[in-house]
Amino acid sequence: MPTDIFSFKQFDIDQTGCAMRVGTDGVLLGAWAGEDAAGSIPQHCLDIGTGTGLIALMLAQRFPQARVQGIEIDPIAAECARANAAASPFSDRIVIASGDILDSSLESLIGNQRFDLIVSNPPFFKSSMHAPDRQRTMARHEETLPLEKLICRASELLSPQGRLALITPRDRLKDLRLYAATYRLVSSRLTEVRTLPHKEPKRLLSEWRPADTAIDRSPFTDTLIIHPATGYYSPEYVRLTEPFYTTSFRILAVG
């Protein structure tokens, strides 16, 4: 039976009662989002659908000057995230709000703040695949946070130089580009995630920025392979996640 406490190097995640537990998707997004070759460091971050608070805590660890806000529609998960943030070394820089990011009343919590970095690991299952309990359905099914509405809302909350970072199924890229163009965002980074070299990519890490035009410039897409061989991890995966995981990795260079 899985433990309710997942320990990282600088913080713990208590998952008691939470529908969605710590997983590879969240860890990848928290480690990947906001990397910028130009050296731009976000000062104000927003985690939409923060769940246990995992990604919010990862951002607080990576960006010591940043203030991080998490928003979670499930009140049980929001309380869990608050407790995890309060127990962390970053408690003075993290605020967790309970509510629906699509609800205009949340302006009272966000105020006029615009964010340099918005992240989300959104639900992506379709309504025909409902989980038996409501809490898990909210966490896993897109009807609670449709991708287009998420991108629309994020575009309203981004600062002029802000970035929106997402992890989604790879097959949603066409939809992502359509919705981003509608709300005048362009892609700046795309990373396909493969578990093994011979497997098709199942996940996509994508980053989007406000644009003067709604034309997607289709940036170079790179690939992250988690396991170059069974039982081993790639150097790139280790580089991303080593600051967080407490375990040692068996590394095998790709190529």
Swiss-Prot record:
InterPro entries: DNA_methylase_N6_adenine_CS, SAM-dependent_MTases_sf, Small_mtfrase_dom, tRNA_Adenine-N(6)_MTase, tRNA_adenine-N6_MeTrfase. It is found in: Cytoplasm. The keyword Transferase applies. It catalyses: adenosine(37) in tRNA1(Val) + S-adenosyl-L-methionine = N(6)-methyladenosine(37) in tRNA1(Val) + S-adenosyl-L-homocysteine + H(+). One of its GO terms (cellular component) is cytoplasm. One of its GO terms (molecular function) is tRNA (adenine-N6)-methyltransferase activity. Its main location: cytoplasm. Its EC number is 2.1.1.223. It holds the Pfam family MTS. Keywords: Cytoplasm, Methyltransferase, S-adenosyl-L-methionine, Transferase, tRNA processing. GO terms for biological process: methylation; tRNA processing. SUPFAM superfamilies: S-adenosyl-L-methionine-dependent methyltransferases. It comes from the Bacteria. Belongs to the methyltransferase superfamily. tRNA (adenine-N(6)-)-methyltransferase family. Specifically methylates the adenine in position 37 of tRNA(1)(Val) (anticodon cmo5UAC). This is tRNA1(Val) (adenine(37)-N6)-methyltransferase.
